[in-house]
Amino acid sequence: MISTNNSSTPETIIALSTPSGAGALAVVKLSGSRALEIALKLSRRDHLQPRHATLANLWNREDEMMDEAILIYFKAPHSYTAEEVVEIQCHGGTLIARKIIQEALALGARVARAGEFTYRAFLNGRIDLSQAEAIGKLIEAKSDESYKVLLKQLKGELGRYVEGVRGSLVEILAYAEVSIDYAEEDLPSDLEARMVEKIERIAEDLERIYQGSKRRSSLVEGYKLAIIGRPNVGKSSLLNALLLWERAIVSDIPGTTRDTIEESLHLGNHWVRIVDTAGIREAQDAIEKIGIERTLLALKESDMVLALFDSSQSLSPEDEQIKELLRAHQENRRILVLFNKSDLSRELQDSELESYPHRYISAKEGGVEELLSLLASWLDEQGGGEELMLTSERQLLCVKSALGELKEARDRLIEGELELFAYHIQGALKELSLITRPYETSELLDVMFGQFCLGK
């Protein structure tokens, strides 16, 4: 559990901020009221100039030199945590950094918990909660598109938007209070209509961002692409062709792939998780049955589907099952029908399959370059460009709840129930505030910041 000291001098924390292991450099970070004091004792210097790199030898309690390092002092509040911070850049490897941390602990620091540096930045008002979430996700970002979205959030664009909406709602709430307190006074006749229009405009904008964010929800974590088809249709060959290496076993024996195989690759500016699934047919044994069940789950969870059919053969009963699955799952996902084995004579003709976006390919002989280009262009359309985005389930839930409150507020205003109208406007304000500055105390924040890496 992340905790903070309630005194005016919170504990000084220390952690390795770079990945543990062999490397040219390692960065050890101190934060807290005694960070400078501890760094001066380690380096045996009488001062460090803020924001200047200082080359110094580091010493232990036995007067043994531990390393030659660079120290950078960030004076509060101009640091990541808004506290006194010292970064120690020492030589890489685990041993040197561990010795430095051990000495700092002996001088009064304690080991930082996961995410505690960012937690302190949040508590000290340097960042809001949406920015803290962006930091955690930015560390894990795997694509240019997710990087751009998260960087905008880190810069505070979501926070500024939320504060703008809150400001508008506060003005509306003021109208409610005036109308309640001065019910007998003559107020402008069109005031209620203007307030209704303003609420509807705010709700419409929030709904647009909410729906757009749901549609693009896979952008940050990576889009999921499922390859489906009957056994022995060429799914594993296609996976290998997309990856440019032999990931899956390719065999003429039907049912070779009995479980889902997941790999990832970059498509243009996007990170995509490709799932090669077990062939759809009547299961021959319990293990194959489990594999087929996982295939159906992968289909339900996918953002895009590549449905593979053998163009050199007429449709089989298993192919008809695939067609039924496509009909059932064509909402909220892109489907591309691939007629494989185009290097052989074409026997398959089916108007329903050809009504989907489709391509003729040969997974063994080539032709996947055009396919990759098409998928990348689809993902570009899905990305949404520079549009503001909610990047966590928590943010989505807050906006969804705020929309519910705004709908109730609008209805109550039209009915003339001003006190209930004010109550629901306050509810919307609270829900939106949770995006950047939650009322909840330790439990929610412990879960959030506990997902960060040590040293962040």
Curated annotation (Swiss-Prot):
It holds the Pfam family MnmE_helical. The keyword Cell inner membrane does not apply. It is found in: Cytoplasm. (6S)-5-formyl-5,6,7,8-tetrahydrofolate binds at residues 29, 87, 126, 456. Belongs to the TRAFAC class TrmE-Era-EngA-EngB-Septin-like GTPase superfamily. TrmE GTPase family. Exhibits a very high intrinsic GTPase hydrolysis rate. Involved in the addition of a carboxymethylaminomethyl (cmnm) group at the wobble position (U34) of certain tRNAs, forming tRNA-cmnm(5)s(2)U34. This is tRNA modification GTPase MnmE.
